[in-house]
């Protein structure tokens, strides 16, 4: 029975790497950033892969804990030090008027914390908008892929 349970667990973990990455990132954020109440998870792939856990710390401050793919480096950003996820989405909707927003992720681009919004243009083409977390300014725009 133990062997069957172990085999099922290994199979389930192998089939669900995103859940494994999320669980690992939450554990790192809780240990190194004193994250108390996780409420979001983002996976960012650009020049490198980053996992971000959002939530509240022990002082009840909103934080983002940005973790590199290896899990050996974590950086904490106060949510109040930049634009919110909703602000990033609002800017995307108002300036780009997309057909549909497909995804939004928090990550690191050119050593800056960023929001990356993936959307479909009105013509249905894939687009990427990268916004500076601290200023909300556009860092990169890739359109009509």
Walk through the language-model features, giving the residues of each.
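Conserved histidines in hydrophobic membrane contexts and catalytic metal-binding motifs
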Residues: 29, 46-72, 79, 88-145
């Amino acid at each position: 029975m133990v062997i069957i349970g172990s085999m099922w667990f290994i199979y389930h973990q192998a089939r669900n790497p995103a859940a494994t990455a999320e669980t690992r990132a939450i554990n790192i954020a809780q240990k190194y950033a004193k994250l108390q109440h996780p409420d979001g998870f983002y996976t960012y792939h650009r020049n490198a892969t980053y996992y971000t856990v959002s939530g509240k710390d022990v002082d009840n401050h909103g934080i983002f804990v940005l973790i590199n793919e290896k899990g050996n480096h974590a950086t904490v950003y106060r949510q109040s030090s930049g634009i919110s996820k909703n602000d990033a989405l609002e800017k995307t909707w108002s300036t780009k008027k997309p057909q549909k927003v497909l995804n939004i992720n928090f990550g690191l681009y050119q050593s800056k914390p960023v929001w990356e919004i993936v959307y479909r243009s009105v013509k249905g083409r894939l687009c990427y908008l990268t916004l500076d977390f601290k200023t909300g300014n556009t860092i990169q725009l890739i359109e009509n892929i």
